[in-house]
Each structure stands twice: as structure tokens, then as C-alpha cells.
A protein has these predicted regions:
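Outer-envelope exported proteins of Gram-negative bacteria
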Residues: 46-49, 108
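Conserved catalytic core of two-component sensor histidine kinases
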Residues: 17, 44, 51
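N-terminal single-pass transmembrane signal-anchor helix
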Residues: 2-34
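Residues at secondary-structure transition points
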Residues: 5, 37-41, 45, 98, ...
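Periplasmic/extracellular, small/polar-rich flexible segments of pilin-like filament-forming proteins
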Residues: 59-148
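Alpha-helix exit/C-cap motif
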Residues: 37-41, 49-69
Length: 148
């Protein structure tokens, strides 16, 4: 009479470990890319909100708000201290002829945060005309990809 052995062999266990390693090696970068693309909304939505608040500010004051008025509560400012999740820094620059004529608002990814590794959509901009642009970390235009 022979005894039947039950359980797993070392080879079977190693095969399972290798398969899990392959799944993790493929899955983690894909998930990371998904999170980066999803977090881009933090910058774009903040800029669109800022642009709407700029128009409201302009209607009341006949001049666009400056960078110093970014965080001040309405109606003295725009009421936007930062993006909702803090992945982007917001700044406002006057147009060539000054804030009475126009502005350019910029959202730049915060280094060290999750968006700090987003090389494809590092900065977003919008101006008083609604013109949207986006650039990579190397300052190459990537508007078509980033403002989808």
C-alpha cells in the first residue's frame, strides 16, 4: 500500500510566485498611469473655476484679479487658494498691457506630490479669451492630450 502525498511542491509554489510577480509588474505601472491621468482634472477644473471667477471679478471691478488676490474671498478676490487636492500650484500673470486687458492663469504640478511625476501634462494655462494650452516638463506643447 502506498501513501498518497498531499500539498504543494516547491516548484508549484515558485510558479505561483513568478505568475504573481508578472501580474504585479504589469498592473502597478498601469494603475499609476491611470491615477496620474485622473488627477489631471484637479488642475483643469481649478483653472476653469478661476477663469469664471476672473470674469465675475472683472464685471465688478473693471480689471482682472492679480496673483495677490487669488486666495482672497469674493468679491475682493477670486476665492481660490489652491486646487481641490493640492496637486497643482495656481498663479496669475498680467497680459502684456496689464490686468485691465487680460491675464494668463497657470496650474503647475507640485513636485513631490502624485502629479509631480506627470511629465506629459506638467503645466496648464488659460487666458481671458479662454485659450487653453498645456506643456510637458520639457515645455513642449501637449495641449491636445492634456485638455481632453
Amino acid at each position: 500500500m502506498s501513501k498518497r502525498q498531499t500539498g504543494m511542491t516547491l516548484i508549484e509554489l515558485m510558479i505561483v510566485v513568478v505568475v504573481l510577480g508578472i501580474i504585479i509588474a504589469i498592473g502597478v505601472p498601469s494603475y499609476r498611469g491611470y491615477i496620474i491621468r485622473a488627477n489631471r482634472v484637479d488642475g483643469t477644473s481649478a483653472l476653469l473655476r478661476l477663469a469664471a471667477n476672473q470674469e465675475r471679478f472683472y464685471m465688478q471691478n473693471n480689471i482682472y484679479a492679480s496673483n495677490a488676490q487669488l486666495a482672497a474671498a469674493l468679491p475682493a478676490g477670486l476665492g481660490i487658494a489652491a486646487t481641490d487636492h493640492g496637486y497643482y500650484n495656481l498663479t496669475i500673470a498680467a497680459a502684456g498691457a496689464g490686468l485691465a486687458v487680460g491675464y494668463t492663469a497657470t496650474a503647475t504640478a507640485v513636485a513631490g506630490e502624485s502629479q509631480g511625476s506627470d511629465a506629459d501634462c506638467w503645466t496648464y494655462t488659460i487666458n481671458e479669451m479662454g485659450l487653453r494650452t498645456a506643456a510637458t516638463q520639457g515645455a513642449a506643447d501637449n495641449t491636445g492630450v492634456c485638455w481632453q
